Amino acid sequence: MTEQQCIALKRKAFQTYFSSLNEQQQKAVFSVNGPVLVLAGAGSGKTTAIISRIVNMIYFGDGYAKADGFLPEEDAVWLQDYIDGKAETDVERLREILAIAPIRPWNILAITFTNKAAGEMRARLASTLGEEIAASVNASTFHSACVRILRRSITLLGYDSDFAIYDADDARRLMKNCLSDVNVSEKQFPPRSVIQEISRAKDAMISPAEMLEDAGGDYRKMMIAKLYGVYQQHLRASNALDFDDIIYLTVELFRRFPEELAKYQYRFPYVLVDEYQDSNLVQETLIQCISGERFDRPNVFMVGDVKQSIYKFRLARPEFWKNTAHTRRRRARTRRSSFTRTFEAGITYWNRSMRFFTVS
């Protein structure tokens, strides 16, 4: 058997193991290293692709892309039988033959937007990998991941690690106190409305000082900025965060303390993000911090569908797919695939190169 035949046989075994996936899903699953962006329509199985990709990373590493021409005859015979359906699936033997640099589950950070989606991801991983391995994968929402980071490191920002997290009712009550502090009426500045503007500012990574600077001579904007500053002072005095602070302060932590960022960059060399079209600037920046800024070709895998964005009211930026702020550095021609055709297209990409798949 020639070297090329050995490589082809190994890759056919990969395709057999992941035969429940279509061709485009398999391409996404087997592209382990480097940045990958997948556009997937509703019902196209994007969550299935993410789950299968994590399984492939843990079981086989980069074995598909880096398959070599070495294959003992006994293994070649068994692989062919497996491909032909004459041998039962033996994951351990497949791993022994096919795996190259398998990835440790605790080095994978898988992010989604809702607790329900994160729970489904963990459950599906457990059904394939087993409870113990699946529990080692860091599958969570943006906010859950950031809370864990802040519990360990927020003292660097002047908070205690046992900080409270205010819900919407807590935030409104606090804003009423802030309105009293600056001697303006709730009728003129409804607490809910003010909090919504502050929330949008945090999602856009705008500080109270920046908001005040942007206000110019506009009285209402100046008062909102002032209330924003007073609100943050009260939160800090109470050792509390609101919901928006969770990601906002995590990004601030990483920007002010590069040594803390480095810990998480090296802990999570592989990052996967589902429903990325729903991300706003602060979330995009968080992912860029962890996966992008220190590395030439970050191992980040993003899946989404611009037509399904449901968080525009929170400044989600589905236009990311066309021209996002943190992918403007360079351009290149990169391979783009769909079910019915393959063609070359100019795509803005993460840093130096981004593989780009369309899954319909």
PLM regions with names:
Residues 3, 44-47, 56, 62:
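Glycine/alanine-rich phosphate-binding loops at beta-alpha junctions
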Residues 67, 73-91, 98, 153-181, ...:
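A substrate-engagement module of RecA-like helicase motors
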Residues 169-235:
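Coupling/switch/interface segments within P-loop NTPase motor domains and analogous charged loops
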Residues 186-196, 208, 213, 332-360:
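Coupling/hinge elements of helicase-like and P-loop NTPase modules
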Residues 9-42, 47-51, 70-78, 82, ...:
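Conserved helicase NTPase motor core
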Residues 56-66, 103, 130-131:
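Post-Walker A helix-loop "phosphate-sensing" segment adjacent to the P-loop in P-loop NTPases
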Residues 165-168, 325-335:
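Conserved P-loop NTPase motor "coupling/switch" region that bridges the ATPase
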Residues 105-196, 319-323, 351:
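Conserved P-loop NTPase-based nucleic-acid remodeling module centered on helicase motor cores
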